[in-house]
């Protein structure tokens, strides 16, 4: 029996991903450019709609949550199985973005006990760079399938710290598939991804000193030089791959530069190109506006 067209099917590797030497996760992958739905290759509509949701939520803080809730329901109608309730995951969305908007994390984040939130990302997103121990003390633990329902307050504080200190892009993706041999349906996956790939994890977190992984030989030279393959031990164990700069460029293109530039630090616009560390450009207006909001939070 063919899977439901409304389900988010397995994300398959495309040629650019293979060429960049990104290792496929055993069950699903978050770093590809193609979602296969009804047999057609489509750029992740999840990403585009979550980007629009994020763009409309953050600038006006909490005043637009009614509109955001309806936007989230549209996403869930498209990406959840028919008959599944979108309300529980929408509560997770509101909690996460309310935490990003700078409100009190302890009062804002109320993750329902029956919703598992999986957090993936590099250390500057997960622990702010000061975890100090081999991953066990990392806030919400980037290791495979950390359940943040028990640790919601710390999750909000660390995500907010990551946004303030390092500039992270956050997208919420409903997930359906097998994770470590267990089947999860109706899982809201909060994906926190650092966009500042020029900073290597070894400068931010002591965990990176334990086991350093060199970029694969078949990776393009530009990618090896820019440090886009994260050497961090936890990234290697928990992610099995790193979201690449090429994907971020595609996000910028698809979201019409609303969100990726809205959060992206100014020094990453030319990351991976020759002379990137010496080049400066004026920030786009959306980023300057976001920066003012972050400083006033």
Curated annotation (Swiss-Prot):
| Name of the protein this chain belongs to | Uncharacterized protein TP_0922
Q: Residues annotated as region Disordered?
A: 267-297
Supply the source organism for this entry: Treponema pallidum (strain Nichols)
Q: Where is the composition biased (Basic and acidic residues)?
A: 288-297
């Amino acid at each position: 029996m063919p899977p439901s067209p409304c389900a988010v099917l397995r994300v398959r590797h495309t040629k650019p991903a293979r060429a960049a030497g990104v290792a496929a996760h055993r069950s699903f992958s978050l770093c590809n450019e193609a979602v296969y739905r009804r047999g057609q290759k489509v750029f992740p509509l999840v990403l585009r709609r979550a980007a629009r949701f994020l763009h409309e939520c953050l600038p006006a803080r909490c005043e637009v949550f009614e509109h955001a809730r309806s936007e989230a329901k549209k996403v869930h109608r498209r990406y959840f199985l028919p008959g599944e309730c979108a309300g529980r995951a929408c509560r997770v969305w509101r909690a996460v973005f309310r935490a990003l908007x700078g409100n009190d994390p302890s009062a804002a984040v109320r993750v329902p006990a029956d919703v598992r939130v999986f957090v993936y990302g590099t250390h500057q997103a997960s622990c702010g760079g000061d975890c100090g121990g081999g991953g066990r003390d990392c806030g919400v633990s980037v290791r495979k399938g950390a359940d943040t329902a028990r640790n919601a307050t710390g999750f909000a504080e660390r995500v907010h710290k990551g946004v303030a200190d390092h500039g992270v892009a956050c997208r919420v993706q409903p997930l359906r598939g097998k994770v470590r041999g267990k089947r999860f349906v109706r899982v809201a996956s909060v994906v926190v991804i650092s966009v500042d790939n020029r900073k290597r994890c070894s400068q931010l977190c002591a965990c990176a000193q334990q086991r350093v992984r060199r970029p694969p030989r078949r990776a393009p030279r530009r990618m090896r030089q820019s440090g886009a393959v994260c050497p961090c031990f936890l990234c290697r164990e928990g992610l099995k791959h790193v979201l690449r700069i090429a994907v971020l460029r595609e996000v910028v293109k698809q979201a019409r530069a609303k969100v990726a530039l809205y959060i992206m630090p100014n020094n990453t616009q030319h990351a991976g190109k020759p002379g990137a560390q010496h080049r400066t450009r004026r920030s786009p207006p959306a980023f300057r506006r976001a920066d003012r909001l972050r400083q006033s939070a």
